[in-house]
């Protein structure tokens, strides 16, 4: 018994300590890949067998499965114990034995990997090749796919029907699957299935949900080349008497076979990321997530309820309940199988114990001589060795079985524990959701009954703030409008007063006429009474007078009619004036808007120019003044030393004649020291002058080097852009994988169910779901109302203010609400931009103040130096005057002369330095004046431009294009200046950074090895290297000497590609390098299979340009009018199209000409690729003709394509006729 216990303990320790961490399972299948393995399911009787066809190559990984007689039993037991009930074929459902299609085959492979992978296992694929280690994340990822495949087996059966191997069931299954699963289940599908799928896709129109993917693959082909050699033949008899006979040679052709890889590409339309289904629609999960995120933004409590609603949506669905019950039954089946296995293990342990006890009994009973003789025979070495080997083999077999069983036990127990924890969490979430839903119902009822005070207060505050802002912003324009209104009212009052005066004068004249008429009548009556007898004589006079009166009255009536007409004319003029005023107001507003936009643009350009100029000034000051500062500090230190020495010497010189004899011996030493210091000062000043000269020289050299550096910078920027693009593509794939993984896990959480079936909870869930669904539209309405309130608040407040201000204005002069809104928007924009411009101007003023402060500091330093020099000179002169009586007067005089001369030289140099600083200040002031002049000239230009536009309205399009061409060289000059400053800064920072880099490289020598060890990919690196060499062949540094592929430089089967100045080799596995001579890996390593190909996203590259100007000089045709430029690869300034990707491009061009003879070329990198020509042979008469052409070229990254006119002219025409277009067909 003790031995049995030790045996069991050893086996358990072995399986627990080693089997869990280093258990390796290897499965193989015959290389045909078509052998079918029959596997009985858990719930099916033994006569019902389901056949699974396992493919050797899938989209995920190519895994060859090898079965050994030792592993088949364990594998069969695993498959029997772990097949879920969704894969079983029950006779009641009527499901037939059918072979899976291509999509189902891929799922079968994933299922096998999921069911048989341990927790931390390293699985060997492709025996004889490298072993691929799978991490926990990839295992979980595959497990999620296996669980999804179990769920979707039922959907495949329902959609596909009872289809067999054909493509009906496969397409149906693919239609209902996620995009990630369709990508995995592609595999090596049948041709019929693919053709059907493509036909259904390409018949429909392409929208934004579809993306083009290019399928590329390398196919090796054999090329036959005939190598011709000429062999001289024998000399025959010569028939000529004089001269030499010709030699005859024989032609021999030898066939030479070569391998060449051709790139085979095909275009395929697929759903973009985030879309799925046959019509590439948005996923349901993403739509729900969008809805829930919009709801969550409105209110936090509402968002929480919606999120919990999303988790509990499946509580009332019968399908979800059925899935949950199926999974519970499946877990119960697993538990029963585990119990059976534990019973079997206990039985085997009991059998071992019984055999051990029987052996002990036999040994105790049989103590005879025969048994002892047998024991003596058994004590020989050979028998002992045999017994040991047998025991070891049996022990190993038993140990392996125990490891497998214990690993399975751990796996099942861990899965059960995970399921139990997940169900517990779900129950907790359900309870929390029920409680939160009840609380939310109360909260929603409270919210519906009463509006929140906080929102109302916020709205009031917001309205008050908006009113204040409106009053601040609209005071000036409203005052101006009021002034105009008062002016117009005064003009109208004047016109009314004039009309009133006119009417009064008319009334007065009419009254006077009536009075005159009455007087005449009275005089006539009196004359009739007095002169009755003389009536006959007067009657003739009266008739004449009456006729004249009638004529006068007619004339006056005509005058009155004319006056009324004049009044009507004046009224119509007043109306016309009001209408014209309104029109002028509208025109003035439009002009003001245009002028404001132009002023903004001009101000922006001026600010940019001033900023660039200030940057240049700051850099020049930093380059010139900072080293001068260091030199001046050194000068001040040396002068301080001089003053200190002179102070030490001063008491010695002031002493009496007793010390003069000793001083005579010490004076030469001190003079030598002073001379050395003065020499140092002169050398420092000379070095300063030399540094200034070198700075000027370097500045000139840098100006010359800027043009060369521009091209290098552009190339580097393009290379970095490509690398960033590749990195972004990789990160997008990683993000898509992560999103798919999260979505898969989210789907798994929905499929989990509780162990206990509580009917009351389900009824509550349904009722709560109905209540929540009733609340959702109300929440939507609330969100919409709040958004409309927030968005339209400013507009309504503005309308109210405008209505108040316009209440007293007459109806004729009221302005429209739209005009006020436009004015309000314009004033808001102008105020914000003015604030920005004020900030920028304040920054500029601060910088100018800093420069002035720096110059003042330098001036003060120079004055300090001059004062120090004078202080050092004064005591020395005084001491010399006191002690100039005694001997050695000549020596002292000589020394004084020397010192005076040197100090004078120092003074002259300091004066020279001050002059240099003065010249620097002059240059600074000149630069500032230049900036001001430039700004004034630009403002004058801006003022004159609208006048020119008014005068040249028919040619306004040509004028705009001319302006763009005028502005572009100025911008280029500015950019060149900025680039020159950049290069200066880089050159200055390089020597300091190189030393730091060398130090950091010494410290980080050990780091790259560790990083490379961590970053070992599971795939061969040669595939990546080959792809990079095919794409970015322009990144290689080309030599100056041109060498083509005519010499066949690529070795070891590599293919040669001609470039602009050199060639590149696309090497075969496992070689790399410039000539395919460097070997990467061992010979036993497998080559990458390029025949399967790969899918890549096809970028959008297309351009369309036209030519509107006239062209009379031969050269490159500059198409100035650019309509389409996807990819930003065509530059109108040069007329060249730069290739952004390696691939096949299509170009088309049309050229119009009136000349008798026109010709030109389509140029690729300076080489004439195609020619176009047209000539009128009969006569030199000019005629209108249009040339068209197209080309399909395979081009490399960095190459340039343009059109060159060799002979003839192109007329100016608008709309244009001469065009040039091109686009990327597909990448290679």
UniProtKB/Swiss-Prot annotation:
<dbReference type="GO" id="GO:0031093">
    <property type="term" value="C:platelet alpha granule lumen"/>
</dbReference>
<dbReference type="InterPro" id="IPR001073">
    <property type="entry name" value="C1q_dom"/>
</dbReference>
<keyword id="KW-0732">Signal</keyword>
<feature type="coiled-coil region">
    <location>
        <begin position="503"/>
        <end position="523"/>
    </location>
</feature>
<feature type="glycosylation site" description="N-linked (GlcNAc...) asparagine">
    <location>
        <position position="981"/>
    </location>
</feature>
<keyword id="KW-1015">Disulfide bond</keyword>
<feature type="coiled-coil region">
    <location>
        <begin position="675"/>
        <end position="726"/>
    </location>
</feature>
<dbReference type="GO" id="GO:1990972">
    <property type="term" value="C:multimerin complex"/>
</dbReference>
<dbReference type="GO" id="GO:0031012">
    <property type="term" value="C:extracellular matrix"/>
</dbReference>
<keyword id="KW-0175">Coiled coil</keyword>
<dbReference type="InterPro" id="IPR050392">
    <property type="entry name" value="Collagen/C1q_domain"/>
</dbReference>
<comment type="function">
    <text>Carrier protein for platelet (but not plasma) factor V/Va. Plays a role in the storage and stabilization of factor V in platelets. Upon release following platelet activation, may limit platelet and plasma factor Va-dependent thrombin generation. Ligand for integrin alpha-IIb/beta-3 and integrin alpha-V/beta-3 on activated platelets, and may function as an extracellular matrix or adhesive protein.</text>
</comment>
<feature type="glycosylation site" description="N-linked (GlcNAc...) asparagine">
    <location>
        <position position="816"/>
    </location>
</feature>
<comment type="subunit">
    <text>Multimeric. Composed of varying sized, disulfide-linked multimers, the smallest of which is a homotrimer. Proteolysis of the promultimerin in the N-terminal region, leads to the mature p155 form that is stored in platelets. Interacts with factor V/Va.</text>
</comment>
<keyword id="KW-0964">Secreted</keyword>
<feature type="glycosylation site" description="N-linked (GlcNAc...) asparagine">
    <location>
        <position position="21"/>
    </location>
</feature>
<dbReference type="Pfam" id="PF00386">
    <property type="entry name" value="C1q"/>
</dbReference>
<feature type="glycosylation site" description="N-linked (GlcNAc...) asparagine">
    <location>
        <position position="114"/>
    </location>
</feature>
<dbReference type="GO" id="GO:0007596">
    <property type="term" value="P:blood coagulation"/>
</dbReference>
<feature type="glycosylation site" description="N-linked (GlcNAc...) asparagine">
    <location>
        <position position="618"/>
    </location>
</feature>
<dbReference type="GO" id="GO:0033627">
    <property type="term" value="P:cell adhesion mediated by integrin"/>
</dbReference>
<feature type="short sequence motif" description="Cell attachment site">
    <location>
        <begin position="186"/>
        <end position="188"/>
    </location>
</feature>
<feature type="domain" description="EGF-like">
    <location>
        <begin position="1041"/>
        <end position="1077"/>
    </location>
</feature>
<dbReference type="InterPro" id="IPR008983">
    <property type="entry name" value="Tumour_necrosis_fac-like_dom"/>
</dbReference>
<feature type="disulfide bond">
    <location>
        <begin position="238"/>
        <end position="245"/>
    </location>
</feature>
<feature type="glycosylation site" description="N-linked (GlcNAc...) asparagine">
    <location>
        <position position="783"/>
    </location>
</feature>
<feature type="coiled-coil region">
    <location>
        <begin position="580"/>
        <end position="650"/>
    </location>
</feature>
<dbReference type="Pfam" id="PF07546">
    <property type="entry name" value="EMI"/>
</dbReference>
<feature type="glycosylation site" description="O-linked (Fuc) threonine">
    <location>
        <position position="265"/>
    </location>
</feature>
<feature type="glycosylation site" description="N-linked (GlcNAc...) asparagine">
    <location>
        <position position="680"/>
    </location>
</feature>
<feature type="disulfide bond">
    <location>
        <begin position="271"/>
        <end position="280"/>
    </location>
</feature>
<feature type="disulfide bond">
    <location>
        <begin position="1050"/>
        <end position="1065"/>
    </location>
</feature>
<feature type="glycosylation site" description="N-linked (GlcNAc...) asparagine">
    <location>
        <position position="576"/>
    </location>
</feature>
<feature type="glycosylation site" description="N-linked (GlcNAc...) asparagine">
    <location>
        <position position="921"/>
    </location>
</feature>
<feature type="glycosylation site" description="O-linked (Fuc) threonine">
    <location>
        <position position="216"/>
    </location>
</feature>
<feature type="glycosylation site" description="N-linked (GlcNAc...) asparagine">
    <location>
        <position position="933"/>
    </location>
</feature>
<feature type="region of interest" description="Disordered">
    <location>
        <begin position="157"/>
        <end position="200"/>
    </location>
</feature>
<dbReference type="GO" id="GO:1901731">
    <property type="term" value="P:positive regulation of platelet aggregation"/>
</dbReference>
<feature type="compositionally biased region" description="Gly residues">
    <location>
        <begin position="160"/>
        <end position="175"/>
    </location>
</feature>
<dbReference type="InterPro" id="IPR000742">
    <property type="entry name" value="EGF-like_dom"/>
</dbReference>
<feature type="glycosylation site" description="O-linked (Fuc) threonine">
    <location>
        <position position="1055"/>
    </location>
</feature>
<feature type="coiled-coil region">
    <location>
        <begin position="400"/>
        <end position="430"/>
    </location>
</feature>
């Amino acid at each position: 018994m003790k031995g049995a216990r030790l045996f069991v303990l050893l086996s358990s320790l072995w399986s627990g300590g080693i089997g869990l961490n280093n258990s390796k399972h290897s499965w193989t299948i015959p290389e045909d890949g078509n052998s079918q393995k029959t596997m009985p399911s858990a719930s099916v009787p033994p006569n019902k067998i389901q056949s699974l066809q396992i493919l050797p190559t899938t989209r995920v990984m190519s895994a060859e499965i090898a079965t050994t007689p030792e592993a088949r039993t364990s594998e069969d037991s695993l498959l029997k114990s772990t097949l879920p009930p969704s894969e079983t074929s029950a006779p009641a459902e009527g499901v037939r034995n059918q072979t899976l299609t291509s999509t189902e085959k891929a799922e079968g492979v994933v299922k096998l990997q999921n069911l048989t992978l341990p927790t931390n296992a390293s699985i060997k694929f492709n025996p004889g090749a490298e072993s691929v280690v799978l991490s926990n994340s990839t295992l979980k990822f595959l497990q999620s796919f296996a669980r999804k495949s179990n769920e979707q087996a039922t959907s495949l059966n329902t959609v596909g029907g009872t289809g067999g191997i054909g493509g009906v069931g496969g397409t149906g299954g693919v239609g209902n699957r996620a995009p990630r699963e369709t990508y995995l289940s592609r595999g090596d599908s049948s041709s019929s299935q693919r053709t059907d799928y493509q036909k259904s896709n390409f018949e429909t129109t392409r929208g934004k949900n579809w993306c083009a993917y290019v399928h590329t693959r390398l196919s090796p082909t054999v090329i036959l080349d005939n190598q011709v050699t000429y062999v001289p033949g024998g000399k025959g008899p010569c028939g000529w008497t004089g001269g030499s006979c010709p030699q005859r040679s024989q032609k021999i052709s030898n066939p030479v076979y070569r391998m060449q890889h051709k790139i085979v590409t095909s275009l395929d339309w697929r759903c973009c990321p985030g879309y799925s289904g046959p019509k590439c629609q948005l996923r349901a999960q993403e739509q729900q997530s969008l809805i829930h995120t919009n709801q969550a933004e409105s209110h936090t409590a509402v968002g929480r309820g919606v999120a919990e609603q999303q988790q509990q949506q499946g509580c009332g669905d019968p399908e979800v309940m059925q899935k949950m019950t199926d999974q519970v039954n499946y877990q119960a089946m697993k538990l029963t199988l585990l119990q059976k296995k534990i019973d079997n293990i206990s039985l085997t342990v009991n059998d071992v114990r019984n055999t051990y006890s029987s052996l002990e009994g036999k040994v105790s009973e049989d103590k005879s001589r025969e048994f002892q003789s047998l024991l003596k025979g058994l004590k020989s070495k050979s028998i002992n060795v045999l017994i040991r080997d047998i025991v070891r083999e049996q022990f190993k077999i038993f140990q392996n079985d125990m490891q497998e069983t214990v690993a399975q036990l751990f796996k099942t127990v861990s899965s059960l524990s995970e399921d139990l924890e997940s169900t517990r969490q779900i129950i907790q979430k359900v309870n929390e959701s029920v409680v939160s839903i009840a609380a939310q119902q109360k909260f929603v009822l409270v919210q519906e009954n009463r509006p929140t005070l906080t929102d109302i207060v916020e709205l009031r505050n917001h309205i008050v703030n908006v009113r204040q802002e409106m009053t601040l912003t609209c005071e000036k324009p409203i005052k101006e409008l009021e002034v105009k209104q008062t002016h117009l009212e005064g003009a109208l009052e004047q016109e009314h007063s004039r009309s009133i005066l006119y009417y009064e004068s008319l009334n007065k004249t009419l009254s006077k006429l009536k009075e005159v008429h009455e007087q005449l009548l009275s005089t006539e009556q009196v004359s009739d009474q007095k002169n009755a007898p003389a009536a006959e004589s007067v009657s003739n006079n009266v008739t004449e007078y009456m006729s004249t009166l009638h004529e006068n009255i007619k004339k006056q009536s005509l005058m009155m009619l004319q006056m009324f007409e004049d009044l009507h004319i004046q009224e119509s003029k007043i109306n016309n004036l009001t209408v014209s005023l309104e029109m002028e107001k509208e025109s003035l507003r439009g002009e003001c808007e245009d002028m404001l936009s132009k002023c903004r643009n001009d101000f922006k350009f001026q600010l940019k120019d001033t900023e660039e100029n200030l940057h240049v000034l700051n850099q020049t000051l930093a380059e010139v003044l900072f080293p001068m500062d260091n030199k001046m500090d050194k000068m001040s230190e040396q002068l301080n030393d001089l003053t200190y020495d002179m102070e030490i010497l001063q008491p010695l010189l002031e002493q009496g004649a007793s010390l003069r004899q000793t001083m005579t011996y010490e004076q030469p030493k001190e003079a030598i020291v002073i001379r050395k210091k003065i020499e140092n000062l002169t050398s420092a000043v000379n070095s300063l002058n030399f540094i200034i000269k070198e700075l000027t020289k370097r500045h000139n050299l840098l100006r010359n080097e800027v043009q060369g550096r521009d091209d290098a910078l552009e190339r580097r920027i393009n290379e970095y852009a490509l690398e960033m693009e590749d990195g972004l593509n990789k990160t997008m794939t990683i993000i898509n994988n992560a999103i798919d993984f999260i979505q898969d896990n989210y789907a798994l959480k929905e499929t989990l169910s509780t162990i206990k079936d509580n009917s009351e909870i389900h009824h509550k869930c349904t009722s709560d779901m109905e209540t929540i669904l009733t609340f959702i539209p109300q929440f939507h309405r609330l969100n919409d109302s709040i958004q409309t309130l927030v968005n339209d608040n400013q507009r309504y407040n503005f309308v109210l203010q405008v209505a108040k201000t316009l209440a007293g204005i007459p109806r004729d002069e009221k302005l429209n609400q739209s005009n006020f809104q436009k004015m309000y928007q314009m004033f808001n924009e102008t105020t914000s931009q003015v604030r920005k411009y004020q900030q920028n101007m304040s920054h500029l003023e601060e910088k100018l103040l800093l420069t002035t402060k720096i110059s003042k500091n330098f001036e003060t330093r120079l004055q300090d130096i001059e004062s120090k020099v004078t202080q050092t000179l004064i005591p020395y002169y005084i001491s010399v005057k006191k002690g100039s009586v005694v001997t050695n007067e000549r020596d002292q005089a000589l020394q004084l002369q020397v010192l005076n001369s040197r100090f004078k030289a120092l003074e002259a140099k300091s004066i020279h330095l001050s002059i240099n600083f003065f010249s620097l200040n002059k240059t600074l002031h000149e630069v500032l004046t230049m900036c001001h002049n430039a700004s004034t000239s630009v403002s004058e230009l801006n003022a004159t431009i609208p006048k020119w536009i008014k005068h040249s309205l028919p040619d306004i399009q040509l004028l705009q294009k001319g302006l763009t061409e005028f502005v572009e060289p100025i911008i280029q000059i500015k950019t060149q200046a900025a680039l020159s400053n950049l290069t200066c800064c880089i050159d200055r920072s390089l020597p300091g950074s190189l030393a730091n880099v060398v130090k950091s490289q010494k410290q980080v020598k050990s780091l790259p090895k560790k990083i490379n060890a961590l970053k070992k990919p599971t795939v061969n690196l040669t595939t990546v290297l080959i792809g990079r060499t095919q794409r970015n062949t322009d990144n290689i540094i080309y030599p100056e000497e041109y060498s083509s592929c005519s010499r066949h430089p690529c070795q070891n089967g590599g293919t040669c590609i001609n470039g602009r100045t050199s060639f590149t080799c696309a090497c075969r596995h496992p070689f790399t390098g410039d000539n395919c001579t460097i070997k990467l890996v061992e010979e036993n390593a497998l080559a990458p299979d390029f025949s399967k190909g790969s899918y890549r996203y096809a970028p959008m590259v297309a351009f369309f340009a036209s030519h509107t100007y006239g062209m009379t000089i031969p050269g490159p045709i500059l198409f100035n009018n650019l309509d389409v430029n996807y990819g930003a690869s065509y530059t109108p300034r040069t007329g060249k199209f730069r290739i952004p990707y390696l691939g096949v491009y299509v170009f088309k061009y049309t050229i119009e000409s009136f000349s008798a003879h026109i010709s030109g070329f389509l140029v690729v990198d300076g080489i004439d690729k195609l020619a176009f020509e047209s000539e009128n042979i009969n006569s030199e008469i000019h005629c209108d003709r249009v040339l068209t052409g197209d080309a399909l070229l395979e081009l490399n990254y960095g190459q340039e394509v343009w059109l060159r006119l060799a002979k003839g002219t192109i007329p100016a025409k608008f709309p244009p006729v001469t065009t040039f277009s091109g686009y990327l067909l597909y990448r290679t």
